[in-house]
Amino acid sequence: MLRRAALAALLLLASGCVYYPTVMDTGGVRIRTENGRAVRQGADLLVTLDVLSTGKYGDTIVGVVSPVAKQALLVNGAGGPVNRLEIPGAATVKFTPDSTHVVLASLQRPVERGETFIVTLLFEKSGGIGVVTLLE
């Protein structure tokens, strides 16, 4: 009887010593977006945002889409097209008007100031990840 009680106590104690690995430990990809903002630039919208990669490995943006525009482009600070953008693991990449950002051209409908809409970044590994974007 004492032996069973000791074994039960030992098993109970050992069950509390469980290791739960994080995304970094397992080596996965984890991407999150935030701070989506848009401003008018002529007839187009210029979108800035932050991409947070908290996984061990990075991912690559291969495209952009949005229901408010017929054309969504990933461009560099000079306005030239960017076909692919590497997002390294364990890093934050800021999209600003002076660096890489998104341009929404040929708007499908009028977008009013204060309105929110989704811009979807298409990743090679993670698929589509939406950014809630506010027109300022």
Predicted regions located by residue number:
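C-terminal motif of bacterial Sec signal peptides marking the signal peptidase cleavage site
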Residues: 13-16
